């Protein structure tokens, strides 16, 4: 990661003032699940032994002008983390605009998931199978 001209970093306490004040253009989070319409679940899987604490993710998810996520497409069980509807508690509703994965990049729209690009060699049908049959809009 390289800080570009105009970029900034600061203490986490100051970050909440920046976030809540609407001064953050883009936030990048790591999710457990993301819905095709941009719902974000990134703080709790619902397991009984987990200590639930949403932390500042909810502030980021709704306070940034754009929320992007970066993740592996598949979870450790081989299932897509991009889902029709999140099964885990939500961090934000309809807040994710872009999904960057190890295999493809997507945009979340009101109509559903839009494919932006894939890694070289990954076919559309193979990607659809990995997504578990989730409808996929193609870029114009």
Locations of the language-model features?
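Conserved phosphate- and dinucleotide-binding cores of soluble alpha/beta proteins
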Residues: 1-139
């Amino acid at each position: 990661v390289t800080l570009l001209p105009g970029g900034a970093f600061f203490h986490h306490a100051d970050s909440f003032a920046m976030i809540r004040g609407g001064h953050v253009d883009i936030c990048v989070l790591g999710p457990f699940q993301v819905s095709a319409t941009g719902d974000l679940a990134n703080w709790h899987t619902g397991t009984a032994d987990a200590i639930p604490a949403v932390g500042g993710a909810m502030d980021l998810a709704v306070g940034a002008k754009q929320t992007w996520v970066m993740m592996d497409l598949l979870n450790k069980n081989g299932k897509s983390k991009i889902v029709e509807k999140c099964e885990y508690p939500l961090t934000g509703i309809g807040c994710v605009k872009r999904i960057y994965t190890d295999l493809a990049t997507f945009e979340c729209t009101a109509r559903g998931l839009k494919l932006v690009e894939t890694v070289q060699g990954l076919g559309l049908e193979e990607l659809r199978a990995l997504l578990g049959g989730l409808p996929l809009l193609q870029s114009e």
